[in-house]
Amino acid sequence: MHSPENGPAHVVDALVIGAGQAGLATSYWLTRHGVEHQLLEQRPELGGAWQDRWDSFYLNTPNFGFLLPDLTYNGPEPDAFLPRDEVIGLFRDYAARIKAPVRLGTEVTRMVAVDGGFTVDTSQGRWQARNVVLANGAFQVPRVPPAAVELPGRILQLHSHDYRNPQQLPGGAVLVVGTGQSGGQITEDLLDAGRTVHLSVSTCPEAPRRYRGQDVFHWILQLNLRGPEYGLNGLQADQLPSPAARFMCNPLISGNGGGHGIHVRDLGRRGVRLHGRFEGTDDGDLVFSDDLPARLALVEAGFSQRLGRMADAYIAAAGIDAPPADPAPVDPWLPADSGERLNLDAAGITSVIWCTGYGLDFGFLDIPVLDAWNYPRHSRGVTEVPGLYAVGLPWLTKHLSATLSVVGDDAEFVASHIAGR
């Protein structure tokens, strides 16, 4: 082993930090361009962030959405969804097939720009490279609200990152905070196990699993890839209203059980106690915002006001013969008590699962290239620092840039740029 401080450095033309789907796609294209490179992966095994999903997890992307270079789905079930362990196995097989040069168990600790290149210190030695690709992904630092520290120590707190199944929780009721895809799906997992669940509702939009004759992801994917051909640029990164929008919620859908949309009011009908936004604690009570009816209405209207309209515009512009949209259901159901205050002991809550998203982690990067959101300043993945690139971040170039459907396109552009230096 080489010491980062004292040992001789490994030298390579291009270093790729991360060997998840972004890193592997980049490796594929670098190989095609004949660029010598090395991938560094801090995990002990391949499989990326999919290894952090719960046991019952299924991809939200249908099989037809596998569009990595030299990895597309050609089987009999294009509209089906793969479970977690099959996804992990698929990426391990892919890495072997493309002969990706990966060093596992290698954590990057510091990176600096030196003499027109970069010095990268890791847990397994020092590297020098003329080019570096940041491909360590968007699921790095679990975010938990500051008010989490107010909860008593007897309450088990887990982020969705660490949740695996209901059996790892103590007996008693569970509070799930957040209704993005993780929050909705974990709530269903707990319900199926017969657990009592309280749910703090966020503003992530619901969506139908199928829309106008296709899986809803079909239209989202077409808008990403072909929308600009018809002047429909709403899912292109340069059309975002603000930098914060790069971290907006994805539609509330699931690939479990053959795929379905998750309707928050339906969860309430099934016995989930719905609450507004979690705001903190007060004298042994959990405190929530008192706007649950407005939140539910906002959640339900989100798809039709944005993605649904975009899909309709694409269908019309492309001249696609698609069935009309089903009328949006009007659902007036509300819980008898929205529960702005909830006593932990009276409710029997013994655990909290924070489904509150992730932050980016570039703490190793000792180069002034990050914006106020810890996001690299770039154009199409090419940062303002010569030789430094990014692939696999949300909204890098498009809405789906961080997904296995589009990350290969961004990786191809970046690899071509590296080859041309």
Where are these regions (language model features)?
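Redox-cofactor-proximal catalytic regions of oxidoreductases
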Residues: E45-T72, R97, L267
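A short acidic, helix-capping loop that chelates divalent metal ions and anchors anionic groups
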Residues: N74-P78
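Flavin (primarily FAD) cofactor-binding/catalytic cores of flavoenzymes
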Residues: H2-R43, G47-A49, D79-R421
